[in-house]
Design a protein with these regions (language model features):
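Short, charged cytosolic
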Residues: 1-15
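Extended, folded cores of ATP/NTP-driven motor/assembly subunits in large transport
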Residues: 61-68, 77-82, 87, 91, ...
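A short helix-turn-beta junction within AAA+ P-loop NTPase domains corresponding to the substrate/partner-engaging
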Residues: 685-688, 922-936
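Conserved P-loop NTPase
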Residues: 951-1007
């Protein structure tokens, strides 16, 4: 097997502009200056004012000035001492609780360790003109804003200086006129009443209209949801194509992008509600027990293991310089709609779909609600929350405001606690933030490297910010910095510790310069990680584990202590990262490096109306599949491939039991080890039909079965009546080709004539009306059996050979085939066991069972049904025989046409050589190609190579297949491959397990139960 690694590597160069350093790059210049000032400020008074001896003063300096200087030199949490003190003072000024049950302005001191903590009082904005400017001051200037501002200043006429007295008089005059002048706001808005929830006022969101978030600093933000793909299991070539497509999007995307990954416990309430509705319709008590067990199992696994992720692409409107303020809103709406359309088209080339909701406003509010109220949204949908908010407004007597309730009221949490420096608390959930600093990135990364963070686990969210910079300015800065660094390295010795840093900066500069010359764009990347937990201990543990995970990948992360509020606001889907955090974490990269951060890498399969298969091994999401959903899957067929002992029978029965729970008729054809299906069949009230020489069950292969066509006639109207006799004889030719593989063309013709004569003896002709029994209206006549055909074949020398071969089924050991049908297929769970048949009879028996089931499946096109064909290679064995080719065509017919009858065919095979070799692989590959969903279990190396070629799997996927443990597999559907661990409840496991050790445990447990029951009776 070829395991050659041909994955592309992308470069994320170090920042080409770094702050100055001293002492060979050991300390930052700011830290050294602050340490010197602090040491001087402390040392001079200590040394000069204390009336002590020289030794005592030196000791005093070592105890005071030296520690302070060392602290300033090293810094705190990566910040300089002065910067940290400013952050801490700002935190002390702003620490508060917003919202909560108390309406007072201050929280009692006893609740917070004796400290008087004020709640934030929200004041209306007095200067709307200035708010727009001040809101943008926290963010880096875009494009040539600074340069254009300087040019405008230079072009303005220079005013002559007035004398001081004239200036003073002018100021007083201006002040008086200002007081008399009535202020006019730039933007006419209706005065907004205060929200009932203070948190709703606190959030930097003005309103949500037209699917757009209007921020309080007058920006327009759009949020769209993106469906991810299973990127990491794609081949190297597929990954390369996806990255190229993402590069194309980045080149024409908005200047600022925020990609948010929201992780939470799986939302399974809709699936559970579907299960409960199905339980109400179930009449079989044994199936009800299975459904209750399934319900408990899904709740258990959903609360303990299952995780779901949502991916959001967020961008803002970028106004042109010539846009009029009056037209800005309309221009923003059109521009953002165009941006959504562009993202949809380009991301579709990557394999991603952009979800287009019916109501954009409701979708946007729901996103914010799920983000801000994680605990509440898990149990209370947005519609219920909206009703509660309306009820609160009515209770407060604010009936007139019902139609104008701010959108933030529906999504804001009840309270936010900013009183802790290391975390914040929102409605009982604890939040902490990690920032990847500028020097915390790897220089060489593979495509999709962010999947490490995306799939980190429950309670780990990620925000990625990309900001495209003006190319002309960056080229100028890179050239200037290159010249500075080259002059530095001339003066530095190669033994200095900062030599490598300068050399790296020079290499980075040349890399950026070359990339910019090759039409790449320049970006700044920021990564912010949100960690949530239900208590402080879990939060600290998750923060520690996340740091370890990043360190294992040569990455680094720093905490946002005393800046948790700024991190919280930055993590909102508003494309607005706080300036200090932005500067601390920005890392320069080119378009290729930005595309390597492709984050939509965690594919999930979760259909609310489906059946649970297991848990995704890579991201712990639930795999709930509804193969009958024609909007997602082109057909409901499935192929299960695996070596002996890999778990094919277990997987088949697990699916069959869970489909039966959904009231879907199940038919299982078991050519080998049919007894393994008996335990589950009997425990759900199913019908176990055993076809063997020693069994009383019989299926008359010559029976023309009555098919209910009432549904088809209602759908299509009266149809052309085709001869049912001709169709049956066509099927019988396949049967006899399997029974007599060396049948000549002449014998085939004579057999056809004999079959027509046999049916004629019972009064059946090509006229369908002849099938009706005159004595019993509504029923068919008594059908001929093989013995009737045998008698006709004996009458001619030309057909005597066929009669001798048929004699075994008429008068020999397999005479059970020579009886009328005495079984029914009206049970919802039917197993046809033909494992007692051996040799050529096994193939014949398998065809008889399939023919019987196929007639039943074609009855009602509106009814979902599933046919499980275990070890289908048995029907395809003996390559080269004409009969086997007919049998292969019959299987292909089932695979190709069952979709039109509302059904699904699930094929399982372990002998892949026979499966793929017959007729050059036409039948095996035909079945695979007509199965939209494939489940690949453990395979040997040579078999894995066959499957790799047939399914176009990557080397990584093929290697995984050869190392699968029992109960693990790969699901391939809709161009996505998912590694899954199949999960069964204890009750299901007892019914379908074939493991010898587990069977022994079941036997011992039942014996203990019997002995306990016997003792109780005594």
């Amino acid at each position: 097997m070829n395991h050659k690694i041909d994955r592309d590597t992308y470069i994320i160069p170090p920042n080409f502009i770094e702050s100055g350093t001293f002492f060979g790059g050991m300390f930052k210049a700011r830290n050294v200056i602050e340490a010197g000032i602090l040491a001087f400020a402390i040392g001079v008074p200590v040394f000069s004012l204390l009336p002590l001896s020289l030794t005592a003063r030196i000791i005093a300096l070592c105890l005071t000035a030296l520690p302070a200087a060392l602290v300033a030199l090293i810094g705190i949490s990566g910040e300089s001492l002065s910067s940290f003190l400013l952050i801490f003072i700002k935190y002390l000024r702003n620490r508060r609780i917003i919202g909560g049950n108390s309406a007072e302005d201050a929280v009692p001191a006893a609740e917070h360790g004796g400290k008087h903590i004020k709640k934030k009082v929200h004041k209306p904005d007095k200067a709307p003109r200035r708010s727009r400017r001040s809101g943008r001051e926290d963010f880096p200037a875009e494009f040539d804003e600074v340069r254009s501002y300087e040019i405008r200043q230079k072009l303005r006429p220079v005013k002559k200086q007035k004398p001081a007295k004239e200036k003073k008089a002018a100021k007083q005059k201006k002040k008086v006129s200002k007081e008399r002048k009535v202020k006019r706001p730039i933007r006419t808005q209706e005065p907004k009443p205060a929200c009932l929830n203070p948190v709703a006022d606190y959030l930097p969101i003005s309103k949500i209209e037209n699917g757009i978030i209007y921020t309080k600093d007058h920006r327009y933000v759009k949020v769209v949801e993106v469906v991810p793909i299973n990127f990491m299991l794609r081949s190297a070539q597929e990954q390369r194509n996806i990255i190229y497509s993402f590069v194309s999007y980045l080149k024409i995307s908005p200047i600022k992008l925020q990609i948010k990954v929201l992780t939470r416990r799986a939302e399974i309430n809709r699936h559970l509600n579907t299960v409960r509705k199905e339980m109400e319709q179930e009449t079989n008590e044994q199936c009800l027990l299975m459904q209750e067990d399934y319900l408990q199992f899904v709740q258990q696994i959903g609360s303990r293991e299952a995780i779901t992720r949502r991916f959001f692409l967020i961008f803002e409107y970028e106004p042109w310089s010539n846009t009029k303020r009056s037209d800005e809103e309309g221009e923003a709406i059109n521009a953002l709609q165009s941006a959504v359309h562009t993202a949809t088209n380009y991301l579709r080339q990557c394999g991603n779909e952009v979800i287009v909701p019916e109501n954009w406003d409701e979708f946007t509010v729901d996103v914010l609600y799920n983000l801000l109220c994680r605990n509440e949204s898990a149990v209370k949908p947005l519609s219920v929350r909206a009703q509660e908010v309306v009820a609160e407004y009515l209770a407060k007597g604010r009936d007139s405001e019902i139609d104008h309730i701010p959108a933030t009221e529906f999504c804001a949490p009840k309270s936010i606690d900013f009183t802790h420096g290391h975390h914040i608390c929102i409605d009982g959930l604890y939040y902490a933030y990690l920032l990847v600093p500028s020097d915390g990135y790897k220089t060489q990364v593979p495509a999709g490297w962010l999947s490490l963070i995306v799939n980190a686990g429950d309670g780990i969210d990620m925000d990625m910010f990309l900001s495209r910079q003006p190319k002309e300015t960056i080229i100028q800065k890179v050239g200037q910095q290159l010249r500075i660094n080259r002059s530095k390295i001339k003066d530095a010795s190669d033994t200095n510790t900062d030599f490598d840093d300068i050399d790296g900066a020079i290499r980075s500069g040349y890399f950026l310069k070359e990339g910019l010359a090759n039409n790449e764009d320049f970006y700044y990347l920021n990564l912010l990680i949100t960690i949530t937990a239900s208590n402080e201990e879990d939060l600290e543990w998750k923060v520690s584990e996340m740091k370890k995970l990043l360190l294992s990948q040569d990455m680094n992360a720093c905490t946002c202590h005393f800046r948790e509020e700024q991190a919280f606001l930055s993590a909102l889907p508003l494309v607005a990262m706080e300036k200090k955090l932005y500067e601390r974490g920005k890392r320069n990269l080119l378009t290729g490096g930005a595309a390597s951060c492709y984050p939509f890498t965690s594919y999930e399969m979760c259909d609310d109306n489906g059946i649970l298969l297991g848990v995704n091994k890579y991201n712990s999401s639930l795999i709930i599949v509804d193969i009958f959903n024609s909007a997602v899957y082109k057909n409901a067929n499935m192929s299960i491939l695996g070596t002996s002992g890999a778990g094919k029978t277990f997987t088949m029965q697990l699916m069959a039991l869970r489909m039966r729970r959904k009231n879907i008729p199940i038919f299982i054809v078991a050519p080998l080890k049919g007894h393994e299906f008996h335990r589950a069949c009997s425990n759900v009230g199913g019908s176990f039909i055993q076809i063997s020489p020693a069994s009383p069950h019989c299926i008359n292969v010559m029976e023309i079965r009555r098919v209910d066509r009432s549904v088809n006639e209602l759908l299509d109207g009266p149809s052309i009546q085709l001869s049912e006799l001709a169709a049956k004889i066509q099927q019988l030719h396949i049967f006899f080709s399997l029974l007599i593989p060396d049948m000549s063309h002449e014998e085939r013709q004579l057999l056809d004539e004999a079959l027509v004569r046999t049916y004629n003896t019972k009064g059946i002709t090509h006229d369908n009306a002849s099938l009706e029994d005159p004595a019993q209206p509504g029923q068919y006549r008594e059908m001929p059996v093989l013995g009737d055909l045998y008698e006709i074949l004996k009458t001619s020398k030309e057909t005597m050979r066929m009669a001798h071969i048929l004699n075994r089924l008429v008068n020999g050991s397999a005479s059970t085939f020579n009886k009328q049908t005495n079984v029914r297929l009206d049970n919802k769970y039917t197993v046809l066991d033909i494992s007692s048949l051996t040799g050529d009879l096994l193939t014949v028996g398998m065809f008889v069972a399939l023919d019987f089931v196929w007639d039943r499946a074609k009855a009602d096109r509106t009814e979902e049904k599933a046919i499980f064909i275990d070890e289908c290679w048995q029907l395809l064995s003996g390559a080269g025989a004409a009969g086997v080719r007919l049998a292969g065509d019959f299987l292909l017919e089932i695979a190709k046409t069952i979709r039109g009858y509302g059904g699904a065919s699930i094929f399982a095979s372990q002998d892949l050589a026979d499966f793929f070799d017959l007729d050059g692989g036409r039948f095996g590959k035909g079945i695979i190609n007509n199965s939209k969903t494939k489940i690949i279990l453990n395979l040997e190396d040579d078999e894995a190579q066959r499957v790799q070629e047939a399914l176009h799997l990557s080397d990584a996927e093929t290697m995984e297949i050869t190392h699968f443990e029992r109960g693990h597999g790969l699901i391939s559907t809709n161009n996505n491959n998912i590694m899954v661990e199949f999960k069964a409840s204890p009750l299901e496991k007892d019914l379908i397990t074939t493991d010898r050790r587990e069977l022994r445990e079941i036997v011992e447990r039942k014996r203990r139960e019997q002995s306990t029951s016997a003792e109780q009776q005594i």
